[in-house]
Amino acid sequence: MVNLGFVIAEFNRDLTFMMEKMAEEHAEFLGANVSHKIMVPGSFDMPLAIKTLLQKDDIDAIVTIGCVIEGDTEHDEIVVQNAARKIADLSLDFGKPVALGIAGPGMTRMQAEDRIDYGKNAVEAAVKMVKRLKEIQ
């Protein structure tokens, strides 16, 4: 069984809540276990929580769940680009998959509502990566 940790952004919680529920349902469908969940204020705050979970022996992969909606400035792009870069670095540093389930940047609230399956897709990617990495070890 694949043990997952979820790191979930509270910002835009109405959307990340739906993303989280879809992700949980898909994890159960795939036979994966969500053994740890941590809420963080926003997507930019995820890396430290991810690092902490990756240090646990009972975590095979991390699923990130966040939603960054476009504003009047380029803030959304800065948040997602920096978070994604650090998330990828952590995956490589710890040798464990960290799946990017962050919707955005550059999307409206309506587009965000259409993309609530990003959490589900991240679960799919995390479980596949764990299984495929085990095949080559």
Swiss-Prot record:
Signal peptide positions (record): none
Reactions the enzyme catalyzes: (2S)-2-hydroxy-3-oxobutyl phosphate + 5-amino-6-(D-ribitylamino)uracil = 6,7-dimethyl-8-(1-D-ribityl)lumazine + phosphate + 2 H2O + H(+)
Pathway: Cofactor biosynthesis; riboflavin biosynthesis; riboflavin from 2-hydroxy-3-oxobutyl phosphate and 5-amino-6-(D-ribitylamino)uracil: step 1/2
CDD domains, A to Z: Lumazine_synthase_archaeal
EC number from the UniProt entry: 2.5.1.78
Enzyme class (EC, first level): transferase
Residues reported to bind 5-amino-6-(D-ribitylamino)uracil: 11, 43-45, 67-69, 100
Positions annotated as active site in the UniProt record: 75 (proton donor)
Binding site for (2S)-2-hydroxy-3-oxobutyl phosphate: 72-73, 115
SUPFAM superfamilies named in the record: Lumazine synthase
Keywords associated with the record: Riboflavin biosynthesis, Transferase
GO cellular component: riboflavin synthase complex
Known function: Catalyzes the formation of 6,7-dimethyl-8-ribityllumazine by condensation of 5-amino-6-(D-ribitylamino)uracil with 3,4-dihydroxy-2-butanone 4-phosphate. This is the penultimate step in the biosynthesis of riboflavin.
Subunit structure and binding partners: Forms an icosahedral capsid composed of 60 subunits, arranged as a dodecamer of pentamers.
Protein name, UniProt field: 6,7-dimethyl-8-ribityllumazine synthase
Species: Methanococcus maripaludis (strain DSM 14266 / JCM 13030 / NBRC 101832 / S2 / LL)
Gene: ribH
